[in-house]
């Protein structure tokens, strides 16, 4: 999730080998700051989002290009503007079009500050013990229809939330909940209720 973005470059440096790693980062001002920070650790960045605007289309083309070249793309399913811990279908569409699996990944730190931003951004404090937690791959069939895409979106959302909350509680921390139903756009409320997502 977007709240766990800060430490992702460290993960890839330890497990990624020589395969190039790209992070999808918002083109907004806060995204530019994050982009410069991430670049310091080696990953490349793709500016934009997987939304349906002009910038989103350009970002999606770049994502597909690097995935088909055998590179890896890191994306925050609820970025860049939320709602918190509620996945959009952009990552599902990208995985479907590129015919690649999605690997959920999260982290937590034993001593941290939770910011008051929309995503409840996690800031690890010095001398913390950190834990990175990978989930099982999520495979996306290229022939999925709208119903199938929504099912995969919910699968990703539930899987990553469960993984994140287990990582927090495993360190003795209080789990951060997803945005409540009343915080969501109307079009997402019925889908979440139908999917049984907490």
Q: Where would I find each of the regions flagged by the language model?
A:
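Short gly/pro/ser/thr-enriched loop/turn and capping motifs at secondary-structure boundaries
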Residues: 30-32, 53, 82-83, 109-114
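Residue-level preference for the first positions of well-ordered beta-strands
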Residues: 20, 70-74, 103
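Catalytic core of membrane glycerolipid acyltransferases/transacylases, capturing the structured
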Residues: 1-53
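Catalytic-site beta-strand/loop segments enriched in glycine and acidic/polar residues
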Residues: 60-94, 98
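A cross-family acyltransferase "interaction/gating" segment
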Residues: 85-146, 192
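Generic beta-sheet signal
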Residues: 48, 76, 104-107
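Short, hinge-like loop/turn segments at secondary-structure boundaries
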Residues: 40-42, 64-65, 119-124
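Membrane-interfacial terminal anchoring regions of lipid-handling membrane enzymes
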Residues: 68, 150-198
